[in-house]
Curated annotation (Swiss-Prot):
Keywords from the named record: Acetylation, Actin-binding, Calcium, Coiled coil, Cytoplasm, Cytoskeleton, Metal-binding, Muscle protein, Phosphoprotein
Family statement: Belongs to the tropomyosin family.
Record-level Gene Ontology MF annotations: actin filament binding; identical protein binding; metal ion binding; protein heterodimerization activity; protein homodimerization activity
Chain positions found as N-acetylalanine: 2
Domain of life: Eukaryota
Compartmental location: Cytoplasm, Cytoskeleton
Main subcellular localisation: cytoplasm
Signal sequence bounds: none
Name of encoding gene: Tpm4
Comment, domains: The molecule is in a coiled coil structure that is formed by 2 polypeptide chains. The sequence exhibits a prominent seven-residues periodicity.
This protein's GO CC annotations: actin cytoskeleton; cortical cytoskeleton; cytoplasm; podosome; stress fiber
Stated name of the protein: Tropomyosin alpha-4 chain
Amino acid sequence: MAGLNSLEAVKRKIQALQQQADDAEDRAQGLQRELDGERERREKAEGDAAALNRRIQLLEEELDRAQEQLATALQNLEEAEKAADESERGMKVIENRAMKDEEKMEILEMQLKEAKHITDEADRKYEEVARKLVILEGELKRAEERAEVSELKCGDLEEELKNVTNNLKSLEAASEKYSEKEDKYEEEIKLLSDKLKEAETRAEFAERTVSKLEKTIDDLEEKLAQAKEENVGLHQTLDQTLNELNCI
């Protein structure tokens, strides 16, 4: 009777050990699956981090190109402003010359008025009219010649002033164009800088995620090793119990 009770106890112990072994095996398989899942997530996170790094590199290259274009546009704008300043100085010189010609014209008009006044006075004195008329005709002729020369000069000055004005308008249009390009490039650089900062933030987050996943995997690997050791111990105990049973 005592032998049967001992045998039953051994069987129950075997069953309990077998159940522990099965449970340990299930835990080990579960930990292995969890470890595989964590490895897959780590590989995916590493792939995302690599893609973000490539994206950051592309954004940096695009930012460099935009900065080079902006530098070129600023240089062209500076040259256009210098040309506009030179044209403005030239226009002031022409305006001064035109003012001098206008002064000469006023003097000629005064001389002409004086000649007319003398002519009016000559009407009252016939003899003086005849003598003074010859003088006045000569003076009037010379005055008309000077007036014609002044008119020709004024025409040339007006044409030159028109050309300078047209050139100045062209330079102003070019300056506005370069200013618009400069604003556009600055806006593009701002957008690229924002994208670069966002990509860097995402890359830092991905790197922290990879570190956490690596820590989780290390912990799971340690737990798996412990479970395997427990499983080996249970199998050894089970084998020892079976040997004892066979001896009985």
